[in-house]
């Protein structure tokens, strides 16, 4: 369909946070899926500061004979997308697939993503069919997807599903970006010329609980809005302008009515007081919006802290090294 480089090696990047119960099954099923590809492959497990024995299980898997697993240990919890970016910085494949560790997205779908990417697509997204999440999670996901589509203009069906495939040039370009708040599916679609989606199965979570609580979903929505666009700041200025104009118009109207009908009509100046108050409130919104615009631009320029700190990388055959910092 498109002229694209052939896929010779596949890298599967999986962020892990307190998933000790699902890890053995995850590794077994992901390994089986990769072995069926007929291509070179590797699995990168990124421990995002787990407090259980996830890191120990990962290291053990990397040190087994004939292992294809690279374990990356972060010093603390940085969040799902930062952990994935840490994995991206260590991949060696031509096609990189991201996968959650909770097994709700079956690893058996990996060959389908590889086959679709082989058609020449830069990014292959997925849409979860028959979602097994709670009504709250489904509703929140719909709101977030709608928000992203309206903000970016990219009509993708399911931005929340992390089972996705990216060609290497897209990964390399994302690694050159230095935003601290990164939402990978959106960032990838900004750089992808050829993107598509395929339907995938969605299973119930067998082990543990979801890591996205109500407050984390709220924080995610806020991060999406603030990292994608400055439109809310402009809307704040627009709202302030409307209120200020309305307040000024009301003030003029009240002055005219007071002169025409007499002071008794104006309730001893109460209406005039509200008109003046609305005018000043509107002016304050305008000032806050402009100030926020400048602060937002300054913040975007100066936030240069690392996204994450890689404490240790364990390669197969028991080789390892320690990094002081990364990205």
UniProtKB/Swiss-Prot annotation:
The chain crosses the membrane at residues 236-256, 270-290. It comes from the Bacteria. Pathway: Glycolipid biosynthesis; 4-amino-4-deoxy-alpha-L-arabinose undecaprenyl phosphate biosynthesis; 4-amino-4-deoxy-alpha-L-arabinose undecaprenyl phosphate from UDP-4-deoxy-4-formamido-beta-L-arabinose and undecaprenyl phosphate: step 1/2; Bacterial outer membrane biogenesis; lipopolysaccharide biosynthesis. Its main location: membrane. Keywords: Antibiotic resistance, Cell inner membrane, Cell membrane, Glycosyltransferase, Lipid A biosynthesis, Lipid biosynthesis, Lipid metabolism, Lipopolysaccharide biosynthesis, Membrane, Transferase, Transmembrane, Transmembrane helix. The keyword Transcription regulation does not apply. It is found in: Cell inner membrane. Its EC number is 2.4.2.53. It catalyses: UDP-4-deoxy-4-formamido-beta-L-arabinose + di-trans,octa-cis-undecaprenyl phosphate = 4-deoxy-4-formamido-alpha-L-arabinopyranosyl di-trans,octa-cis-undecaprenyl phosphate + UDP. It is a multi-pass membrane protein. GO terms for molecular function: phosphotransferase activity, for other substituted phosphate groups; undecaprenyl-phosphate 4-deoxy-4-formamido-L-arabinose transferase activity. Catalyzes the transfer of 4-deoxy-4-formamido-L-arabinose from UDP to undecaprenyl phosphate. The modified arabinose is attached to lipid A and is required for resistance to polymyxin and cationic antimicrobial peptides. NCBIfam families: PRK10714.1. This is Undecaprenyl-phosphate 4-deoxy-4-formamido-L-arabinose transferase.
């Amino acid at each position: 369909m498109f002229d694209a480089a052939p896929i010779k090696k596949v890298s599967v990047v999986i962020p892990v946070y307190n998933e000790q119960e699902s890890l053995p099954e995850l590794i077994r099923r992901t390994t089986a899926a990769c072995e069926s590809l007929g291509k070179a492959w590797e699995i990168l497990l990124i421990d995002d500061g787990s407090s259980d024995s996830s890191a120990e299980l990962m290291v053990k898997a990397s040190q087994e004979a004939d292992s294809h697993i690279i374990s990356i240990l972060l010093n603390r919890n940085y969040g799902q997308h930062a952990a994935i970016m840490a994995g991206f910085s260590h991949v060696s494949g031509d096609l990189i697939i991201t996968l959650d560790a909770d097994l709700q997205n079956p690893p058996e779908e990996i060959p389908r993503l590889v086959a679709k990417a082989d058609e020449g697509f830069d990014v292959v997204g997925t849409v979860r069919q028959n979602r097994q999440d709670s009504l709250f999670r489904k509703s929140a996901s719909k709101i977030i997807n709608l928000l992203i589509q309206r903000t970016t203009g990219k009509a993708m069906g399911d931005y929340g599903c992390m089972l996705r495939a990216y060609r290497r040039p897209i990964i390399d370009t994302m690694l050159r970006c230095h935003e601290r708040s990164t939402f990978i599916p959106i960032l990838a679609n900004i750089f992808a010329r050829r993107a598509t989606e395929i339907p995938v199965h969605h299973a119930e979570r067998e082990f543990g609980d979801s890591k996205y609580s109500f407050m984390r979903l709220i924080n995610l929505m806020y991060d999406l809005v603030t990292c994608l666009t400055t439109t809310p700041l402009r809307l704040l200025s627009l709202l302030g302008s409307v209120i200020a104009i309305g307040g000024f118009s009301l003030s003029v109207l009240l002055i005219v009515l007071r002169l025409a009908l007499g002071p008794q009509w104006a309730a001893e100046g109460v209406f005039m007081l509200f008109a003046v108050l609305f005018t000043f409130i509107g002016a304050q919104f305008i000032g806050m919006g402009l100030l926020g615009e400048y602060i937002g631009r300054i913040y975007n320029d100066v936030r240069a802290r690392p996204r994450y700190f890689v404490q240790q990388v364990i390669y197969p055959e028991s080789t390892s090294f320690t990094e002081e910092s990364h990205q």
